[in-house]
Amino acid sequence: MRSIVIIVMIGFALQSTAQPTRIDKAIQLAESEKQTFAATHYATAQSLASGNFVVDYYRCEWNINPAIRYISGSVTSYFTITTATSQIVYDLSKQLTVDSVRLRKKLLSFSQKLNNTLVIHFSTTLSPGKRDSISVFYHGTPPDTGYFAGSFVQTTHGNNIPVLWTLSEPYGAMAWWPCRNGLDDKADSIDIYITHPSQYKASSNGIPVSEMPNGASITSHYKHRYAIASYLVGIAVTNYSVDSRVIPIGNHNVPLIQYVYPEDLTTFQNNTFTVSEALQLYSSYFGLYPFAKERYGQTEFSRGGGMEHQTNSFVTSATENLMTHELGHQWFGDKVTCGSWQDIWLNEGFATYLADMFYTEMIDTTYYMPYVEGDLSYIVSQPGGSVWVNDTTSIDRVFDSRLSYKKGAFLLRMLRWTLGDSAFFKGIKQYLNDPQLRYGFASTADLQRNLESASGQNLDYFFRQWFYGEGYPSFKVQWGQDSITGQVNFIVSEKTSVPLSVDFFKVALPIQLMNGSKKKTVTLVCKFNNQQFTLPDPGFKVKSIAIDSDHYFISANNRAIKQPSLQFTSAAISAPSLQGAKIWVSPNPVTTVATVTLQNVHGHVQLKLFNSTGVQSWTYSGDVQSRSLQLQIPFGSYAAGSYRLVLTEANGSTSSAMIVK
């Protein structure tokens, strides 16, 4: 059986110079983020908020002094009841003290549980659809051990200047405020009021509305009118310097506001162009920045890596890879959030891929291929591991830099090659704007559904292999060129690194044919081992081939083996021309008469049959009006052996098929 062969002309040579520093920094980013999140993700960490209500709105009023690790204030929640109930349950650390809970002005009874929940009791049963609000007044020192460690941090910077910041992914929000802390509910909007000593500035989500003086303190007000997950809410307070500017994106002007340690202000200002260019680039590919009606911002904090707080990424430095990675999360992680930590690649794989896109398109295309090669070497440095997270209780597994970040990003590279740019980006935009997903939660199945809709392809095999499956293939390509017709024959086989998980990877494998400066790339759609392919004469004598030289697929230890006399004796053969024409011969092998079917041809065509010594045995010349033609070749008087049937179209392109008697 033969498969379709696609020919693509290429006219450039790839550089081989490596730039390991960027590769190392990208891996270090993933590892530092893993360490950042490690403290807040343990086997016992989970949201225990009740499922009988959803939160519509939060109004958070907090008192913060960055010199003291302490919080007091209130959180008012507007909610809608989904199941008749007389109580609702919030997530809240048992270490914080709840002073009172009020339904408007009425005090409600409540109880704090050892499992870090706050149970609120109503005097009557609330019916489904009932919308109401409660205010929780509380105070205390947030826990800093176990799975809450690192979620509410007080430290210093510069000349011993106090700074306080939060980082709540994945379950750290409940350490410092009452909320629904799971991946099943987003508040439609939020207002945040932070009262702090007047010598400091506060940073948080959304638009900075006002700074109201209150004697020795100031109340900073932020408002955010987009749906937001609890773990994406963040605050920081210190003596920030503020850098504000406007970034033009098409017909929109998006404010960029940065809160930076004074000692680092110049560095951030000198690198703001990176954020500006990335905002414009990502908007051109994935649609306008998701929170364009408000702003984007960066806040400096003192933890390794960064955190994609919605509209306001917390970053530890003004480095290109970190800033572009966290910005990418605003589309992938914030606008559309993974609905399970098993699908963390929908956040981290995408953000890693976007940072790679920025580098190759805006910084330096010369070093992009060595960077891809470095990523590939890192991914295949171990034989196993899936992008799908099979153990969400392990922080090392959830935030695995090799699998969730790098292999996740490479999965997108493979999808882009498999689908083509048009269908790939169309599908990603559909995913981001899917009414069921936009400003909500998504699964890998949701991404697959939108990519299939955009491309018309069934991608079950792809996600079964590359998302759920472990490992990678090693390809062996045997090849030879016919000295008479010039056509090139291939036999492709593969071995997989974890055959018990994936015994064969179906791929559209690029093969580059080369002879000095002459190069053509063909794509072999590999569906099974030892599959045979025939390629029409590429127009030059092929000296060598390269297997997936641009690294569109994860693979390792590939081998190309030249066999000049490679011949086939398979039963059914198709060989498209440059325009996609096909020759089908049946039966094959033949005894008396062979039926030849031409498809996707038009205009004048010529068919010639040659025996194994190159002698012409039969010919046909005529016009094709309906893009297909069927005719018969009498083989009764021909000697046993192999024959070449060569099709020449009106534009001069040729295809050929082998017929065996």
At which residue positions do the language-model features occur?
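N-terminal, polar/Ser/Thr-rich
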Residues: 18-72, 157-162, 459-461, 465
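Amphipathic alpha-helical substructures
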Residues: 401-490
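Glycine/proline-rich low-complexity spacer/linker segments in large multi-domain proteins
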Residues: 45-50, 128, 137-190, 551-571, ...
